[in-house]
Amino acid sequence: MANIKQQKKRNKTNEKRRLQNVSFKSSVKTVVKQVKTAVANADKQKALALLSVAYKKFDKGVSKRVYHANFSARNKSDLQKLVNTL
């Protein structure tokens, strides 16, 4: 446990951000799974709609500094390749 007052404050904000990041990452994973399920079911319209949602979430994650830009680009590319197989 920290003894310095400012570090105690930082610990609170760090925990708050950590929980927000975990929640955000979970929502991104859910959308990615939905895209993969739509591709498995050969539902191109649904896959394309969910793909745009996934792109938006990945870009938002980069701007919020939850994800590194390369991680986001790699995942978006992989999802696009998957949807292009339809």
UniProtKB/Swiss-Prot annotation:
Lineage: superkingdom: Bacteria
Cystines in this chain: none
SUPFAM superfamilies: Ribosomal protein S20 (SSF46992)
UniProt keyword rRNA-binding, yes or no: yes
Record bears the keyword rRNA-binding: yes
Region span, Disordered: 1-21
Basic residues bias spans: 1-11
Pfam families per UniProt: Ribosomal_S20p
Keywords: Ribonucleoprotein, Ribosomal protein, RNA-binding, rRNA-binding
Molecular function as annotated in GO: small ribosomal subunit rRNA binding; structural constituent of ribosome
GO cellular component: cytosol; small ribosomal subunit
Biological process (GO), any one: translation
Family note: Belongs to the bacterial ribosomal protein bS20 family.
Annotated function: Binds directly to 16S ribosomal RNA.
PANTHER family in alphabetical order: 30S RIBOSOMAL PROTEIN S20 (PTHR33398), SMALL RIBOSOMAL SUBUNIT PROTEIN BS20C (PTHR33398:SF1)
Name the record gives this protein: Small ribosomal subunit protein bS20
Organism: Onion yellows phytoplasma (strain OY-M)
Organism phylogeny: Bacteria, Bacillati, Mycoplasmatota, Mollicutes, Acholeplasmatales
Gene (name only): rpsT
